[in-house]
């Protein structure tokens, strides 16, 4: 038996490469304690090296004593809420979540704001067995066996190539130089401790072909006149040997695939020697040998030099003498000659200084992924991945980010849809920067044609007019509160209407409600009560106000004027008569005439005018066929649209503060917002998540619109201007939080400042509100400091973060409350505020928003 072992050992030594010299230590009797450096490696399968092709050694795992079950108390609801709140704000004591966020934040800062400080990279470049060189261009020196502690000897792994066991130094650039990997004792860790090792990504067993694919291949072979068996053999034999892991049903972790051919016990050597010829080598068929003889020009890949880019792309370590490296596609199978492997990795540009980076730094900038298909629903249904996943599918999963920009995509879809519907329904206003005038001859209320002019502001965004945008939900103060000036304007118009009467033309051509000055004394009769004999009685006395064309309390049935519900003396408080008892012959001149004018709401300030339908349509007004007086209609309700007011006299559409965030002035305006969202907003949402970004986006936009409604109350504004500046404030906060680790923070600061100043100057154009920009930016700063968890530098910084969250939340709530008080209780009228948001380069460049400027 011992002779057989010696034969197997000598046979195995003959198979060893001639350039590999190893000194195997003598067997040491088992000690009471394990060596300190082998304590982490509890499994014997970890004690294998990769000096020979891997095999699955049947080594029994050491016996583990059964652990006692540790009973733990279930966390209370208060502790769960407290821990969840701390995690959400980024001040949790959980080191894993904190390190995860720090890795994402530093990676985002390095990509957006530039290079990090050298000392930051030096601090991150810790001496670890996981460190790796990205270039992999260093060739180790010849094998050397030196002394080691604990009676063991060190083994130099020739295949490590500077991948592992890098030590930190104090160079100027913060990068460390690789050292020769030293494997303690018989455990060669260089091949599986590095993240660049090929055993991190073991090749998977090829899937079985479908019936359709095999049928198609068979038909193609018959058409070409080839044998189906030959094609199958050529496709199947592309490796010098099949890895033993392919024969197993379940894929195990990479340390179990390491070989112990040179360093394991004698029993293991005998077992591996007996199974080595059967499981490793495959004898090529005669057809394959004939194909190889026919193509002698094909280069053998065994022992060839690998290009550096190819090595880094495939993440495969260099093969052994009898390796299983895949040949080029289409290459025939050839016997593998026993030649010495080349230890160089070819690089076109050669090794360059400063191109190596350690694994902790690589993990720092590695994108944290959310497992595809294993989200919240996957956790509830106990969903898991299968044991073997195709490499292409796995690569797609690894390319996905941790946070998906759901809010960005939803917002972009809503913006695009609303803009398309608005343009299709309301059309496109005249394009330009000035005012557009339209002149036409229109039939007026007096029964004659007159030349009238309609003026409207041009829209250079290629979109609807301002009246249409207000009707859709734009920010407009008179629709959100009872504006004092608009309300006084409406009350003055009602007072004039109170003293009006029906003007009946003498030729019986028509009548219209008007004042005495507008009624011709020679061509018409002004039927004014109580002077005119047709005046009705009220409580035994003649009515003092009236008459009203086509409305009289004596002939109206619904609503009827009966005691105790008699119509009041003031005609501006009369209701609309929906049913009349008499026809066209009442012997009352104001009732038997043909009415030529009814109320029409024109403009955006609640102006009502008794006029003809033709004139109302020409002025893009809202004509009321059912009413006879302007006091019977509520023009602000018509102008604002959306949901009717609870009290027709008091506008209450406060929801315009956030509804206008989803509207745009035109197609170009929407394209600008989409570009911003798909670049800046999506990137930040991938970093912070949709919930934080949605809170900052909406609250910043609401605050910006509220400030704009205070200082520019009569200007219709749409678009997420305040929200976008709030998102820009997030970038500033991120820069301030990462100031200590950036190499050139001032450069990044001035770049962001230049972008903000450019957008602020862009807000001097019409239809863009700088007050929303400023308020949205300030509120975005407060919200970003409160809701975005960023890097903490020590325990003191963690406590500072907690105080910062409370302070900035209180400051933001104070800012919002102050703006609400100013808007509803202490209205502000600012004369010069318009120049801050629109500079009048010409007389008609900026639209006049004063109430006395009747543009419509």
UniProtKB/Swiss-Prot annotation:
It is found in: Endoplasmic reticulum membrane; Golgi apparatus membrane. Keywords: Endoplasmic reticulum, Glycoprotein, Golgi apparatus, Membrane, Phosphoprotein, Transmembrane, Transmembrane helix. Residues 434-656, 714-715, 769-773, 826-856 are lumenal. It is a multi-pass membrane protein. It comes from Mus musculus. The modification Phosphothreonine is found at residues 180, 183. The chain crosses the membrane at residues 413-433, 657-677, 693-713, 716-736, 748-768, 774-794, 805-825. Belongs to the peptidase S54 family. Regulates ADAM17 protease, a sheddase of the epidermal growth factor (EGF) receptor ligands and TNF, thereby plays a role in sleep, cell survival, proliferation, migration and inflammation. Does not exhibit any protease activity on its own. GO terms for biological process: cell migration; cell population proliferation; negative regulation of protein secretion; regulation of epidermal growth factor receptor signaling pathway; regulation of proteasomal protein catabolic process. Pfam families: iRhom1-2_N, Rhomboid. Residues 1-412, 678-692, 737-747, 795-804 are cytoplasmic. One of its GO terms (cellular component) is Golgi membrane. Expressed in the duodenum, as well as in fetal liver and head. The modification Phosphoserine is found at residues 76, 176, 391. Homodimer, or homooligomer. Interacts with TGFA and HBEGF. Interacts with EGF; may retain EGF in the endoplasmic reticulum and regulates its degradation through the endoplasmic reticulum-associated degradation (ERAD). Interacts (via cytoplasmic N-terminus) with FRMD8/iTAP; this interaction leads to mutual protein stabilization. Interacts with ADAM17/TACE. This is Inactive rhomboid protein 1. One of its GO terms (molecular function) is serine-type endopeptidase activity. InterPro entries: Inactive_Rhomboid (IPR051512), iRhom1_2_N (IPR022241), Peptidase_S54_rhomboid_dom (IPR022764), Rhomboid-like_sf (IPR035952). Residues 1-21 are annotated as: Disordered. Glycans are attached at residue 584.
């Amino acid at each position: 038996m011992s002779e057989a072992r010696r034969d197997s050992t000598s046979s195995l030594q003959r198979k060893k490469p001639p350039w590999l010299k190893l000194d195997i230590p003598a067997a040491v009797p088992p000690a009471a304690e394990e060596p300190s450096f082998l304590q982490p490696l509890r499994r014997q399968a970890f004690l294998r090296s990769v000096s020979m092709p891997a095999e699955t050694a049947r080594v029994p795992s050491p016996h583990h004593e059964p652990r006692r079950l540790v009973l733990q108390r279930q966390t209370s609801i208060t502790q769960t809420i407290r821990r969840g709140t701390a995690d959400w704000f980024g001040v949790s004591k959980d080191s894993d979540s904190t390190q995860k966020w720090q890795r994402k934040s530093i990676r985002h800062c390095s990509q957006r704001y530039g290079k990090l400080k050298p000392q930051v990279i030096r601090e991150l470049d810790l001496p670890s067995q996981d460190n790796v060189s990205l270039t992999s261009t260093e060739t180790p020196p010849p094998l050397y066996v030196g002394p080691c502690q604990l009676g063991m000897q060190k083994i130099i792994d020739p295949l490590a190539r500077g991948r592992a066991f890098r030590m930190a130094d104090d160079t100027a650039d913060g990068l460390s130089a690789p050292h020769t990997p030293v494997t303690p004792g018989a455990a060669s860790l260089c091949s599986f401790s590095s993240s660049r090792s090929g055993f991190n990504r073991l090749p998977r067993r090829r899937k079985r072909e479908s019936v359709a694919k095999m049928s198609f291949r068979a038909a193609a072979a018959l058409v070409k006149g080839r044998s189906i068996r030959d094609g199958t053999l050529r496709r199947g034999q592309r490796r010098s040997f099949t890895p033993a892991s392919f024969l197993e049903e379940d894929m195990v972790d990479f340390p179990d695939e390491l070989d112990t051919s040179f360093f394991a016990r004698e029993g293991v050597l005998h077992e591996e020697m007996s199974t080595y010829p059967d499981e490793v080598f495959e004898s090529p068929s005669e057809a394959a040998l004939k194909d190889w003889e026919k193509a002698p020009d094909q280069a053998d890949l065994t022992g060839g030099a690998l290009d550096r880019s190819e090595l880094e792309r495939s993440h495969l370590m260099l093969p052994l003498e009898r390796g299983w490296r895949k040949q080029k596609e289409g290459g025939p199978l050839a016997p593998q000659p026993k030649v010495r492997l080349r230890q160089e990795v070819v690089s076109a540009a050669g090794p360059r200084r400063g191109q190596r980076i350690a694994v902790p730094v690589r993990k720092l900038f590695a994108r944290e992924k959310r497992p595809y298909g294993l989200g919240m629903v996957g956790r509830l249904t106990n969903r898991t991945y299968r044991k073997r996943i195709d490499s292409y599918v796995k690569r797609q999963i690894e390319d996905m980010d941790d946070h998906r920009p759901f809010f960005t995509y939803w917002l972009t879809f809503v913006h695009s849809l609303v803009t398309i519907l608005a343009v299709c329904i309301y059309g496109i206003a005249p394009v330009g920067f000035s005012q557009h005038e339209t002149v036409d001859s229109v039939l007026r209320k007096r029964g004659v044609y007159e030349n009238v002019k309609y003026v409207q502001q041009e829209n250079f965004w290629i979109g609807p007019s301002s009246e249409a945008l207000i009707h859709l939900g734009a920010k407009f103060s008179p629709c959100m509160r009872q504006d004092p000036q608009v309300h006084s304007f409406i009350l003055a118009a009602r007072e004039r209407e109170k003293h009006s009467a029906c003007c009946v033309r003498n030729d019986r051509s028509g009548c219209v409600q008007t004042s005495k000055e507008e009624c011709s004394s020679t061509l018409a009769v002004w039927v004014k009560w109580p002077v005119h004999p047709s005046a009705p009685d009220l409580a035994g006395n003649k009515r003092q106000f009236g008459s009203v064309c086509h409305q009289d309390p004596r002939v109206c049935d619904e609503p009827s004027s009966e005691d105790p519900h008699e119509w009041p003396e003031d005609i501006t408080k009369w209701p609309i008569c929906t049913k009349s008892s008499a026809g066209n012959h009442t012997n009352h001149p104001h009732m038997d005439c043909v009415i030529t004018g009814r109320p029409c709401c024109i403009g955006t300030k609640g102006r009502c005018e008794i006029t003809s339908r033709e004139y109302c349509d020409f002025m893009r007004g809202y004509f009321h066929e059912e009413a006879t007086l302007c006091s019977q209609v509520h023009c602000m309700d018509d102008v604002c649209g959306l949901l009717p007011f609870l009290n027709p006299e008091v506008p209450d559409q406060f929801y315009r503060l956030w509804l206008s965030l989803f509207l745009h002035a035109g197609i170009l305006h929407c394209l600008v917002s989409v570009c911003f969202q798909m670049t800046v907003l999506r990137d930040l949402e991938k970093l912070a998540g949709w919930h934080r970004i949605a809170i900052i986006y909406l609250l910043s936009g609401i605050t910006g619109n509220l400030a704009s409604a205070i200082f520019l109350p009569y200007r219709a504004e749409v678009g997420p201007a305040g929200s976008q500046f709030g998102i820009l404030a997030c970038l500033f906060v991120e820069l301030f939080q990462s100031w200590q680790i950036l190499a050139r923070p001032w450069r990044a600061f001035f770049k962001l400042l230049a972008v903000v100043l450019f957008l602020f100057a862009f807000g001097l154009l019409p239809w863009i509100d700088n007050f929303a920009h400023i308020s949205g930016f300030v509120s975005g700063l407060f919200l970003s400091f409160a809701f975005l968890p960023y890097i903490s530098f020590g325990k003191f910084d963690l406590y500072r973060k907690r105080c910062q969250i409370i302070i900035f939340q209180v400051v933001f709530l104070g800012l919002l409350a102050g703006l609400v008080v100013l808007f509803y209780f202490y209205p502000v009228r600012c004369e010069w505020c318009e120049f801050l948001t629109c500079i009048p380069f010409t007389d008609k460049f900026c639209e006049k928003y004063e109430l006395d400027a009747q543009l419509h």
